[in-house]
A protein has these predicted regions:
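ATP-binding/phosphotransfer module of carbohydrate and carboxylate kinases, centering on a glycine-rich
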Residues: 1-41, 45-121, 161, 228-232, ...
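Phosphate-binding/catalytic loop of phosphoryl-transfer enzymes
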Residues: 65, 79, 121-240, 357-378
Length: 378
């Protein structure tokens, strides 16, 4: 029913295999609930004029909360994932996770109020977090870039304020889902996302299924060992790859050239490298080499058709992506494309809306099944 365009009762009878009286009763129930719009009768093709109906994508709403170390993106959307309102707020500082999450939940409720959406019509919220997420438990197990956020019952804290279903997921996983839905990985059922910022992480989709792993740590490539010489080295909580190839490592390789504007320093580095700055060139080559090796390793294990590069490292950074591609080409045996993110910072938001819409549809489907059961067995 939620396909674009109209449908008729006759089509519902044919597709569902249910009787005309059952479909009539269920359709009437859905129209009364506002899930479906009654558009009256359509043109006749020779017989009775058909009753036209349309799924009401604004019968209820979904939302997403993409929590970052400094900024949090909020969005409200309809049941097809079409964004209605979007806002960026500061991630609370100097408070514990309970207070911080409650504050962000209040920000989302304020956004709903400004959009004139009643709280009771919010069916599902997806919350993305930068760290290890226990998906089944709805817990943020560890978030190195959020001080003090460890073993946080995110789902329960947010649900207590929002009073709706909350789904919690790792932000890089959401980014991959977003790119697969509306970005650079569209049409690729086996793909991966490599995120490089202050932290490093990856997400993997195989045959359309997002991988979480036994400990919900699939894609935690920050700890990938980049060579035998690093086996006995202590990298603390950051991990080998993150220490060698994260933004802090790149800044350390080009310390004198980092401008004050954080949005400009990657383009400044690449421009310096193009202009012949030897230190900038080495910084790009060494960093791209590490990321390229890690990307090739992912390709060898996962066999994707495409790997998407995202995060602050790759914003406005096609030359850096080219350097990564050069390394991957020398190492890969199973060819795959390496592309830049199309959605950028909005990728986790898009993925979160996809997750929230899926949960909302699950709820609506359950309600529909109950309605059908009541109609079949009054």
């Amino acid at each position: 029913m939620d396909r674009p365009g109209t449908f008729t009762r006759a089509e519902l009878i044919e597709l569902s295999g249910l009787s005309a009286p059952t479909i009539g009763e269920v359709a009437g129930h859905l129209i009364r609930k506002g899930v479906v719009k009654d558009l009256g009768t359509g043109p006749s093709s020779g017989g009775r004029r058909p009753s036209l109906m349309e799924f009401n994508a604004r019968h209820a709403y979904t939302a997403v909360m993409d929590i970052g170390p400094t900024r949090t993106r909020l969005a409200v959307a309809d049941l097809r994932g079409e964004t209605i309102q979007h806002e960026i707020v500061d991630t609370p500082k100097g408070v514990g996770p309970q207070e911080g999450l409650s504050h962000l939940a209040d920000d989302l409720l304020a956004l709903l109020e400004r959009t004139r959406i009643p709280r009771g019509r919010l069916l599902a919220v997806a919350a993305g977090a930068p760290g290890i997420v226990g998906v089944k438990e709805g817990t943020l197990v560890l978030a190195p870039n959020l001080t003090g956020w460890r073993d946080v019952p995110m789902r329960d804290i947010l649900a207590a304020t929002l009073r709706t279903t909350v789904v919690v997921e790792n932000d890089v996983n959401l980014a991959l889902l977003g790119e697969h839905w509306r970005g650079a990985a569209r049409g690729h059922e086996s793909c991966a996302f490599v995120f490089v910022g202050t932290g490093i992480g990856a997400a993997v989709l195989i045959d359309g299924v997002l991988l979480h792993g036994h400990h919900d740590m699939a894609g935690e490539i920050a700890v990938m060992c980049m060579g035998p010489e690093f086996v006995d080295r202590d990298f603390g909580g950051r991990g080998c790859l993150e220490t060698l190839a994260g933004l802090d490592a790149l800044k350390a390789r080009w310390p004198d050239g980092v401008p004050r504007d954080p949005e400009r320093w990657i383009p400044s580095l690449l421009e310096a490298a193009r202009s012949g700055d030897a230190q900038a060139q080495r910084a790009v080559e060494e960093t791209a080499r590490m990321i390229g090796i890690a990307t090739a390793n992912i390709g060898a294990v996962v066999d994707p058709s495409v790997v998407v590069l995202g995060g602050a490292m790759f914003a406005q950074a096609e030359p850096l992506a080219d350097a990564v591609r050069d390394v991957v080409r020398r190492l890969q045996r199973n060819p795959f494309d390496v592309v830049l993110s199309q959605l950028g910072k909005e990728a986790p938001v898009a993925g979160g809306l996809l997750v929230a819409v899926a949960e909302a549809r699950r709820q609506l489907t359950h309600q529909l099944e109950l309605s059908v059961a009541r109609s079949a067995h009054p």
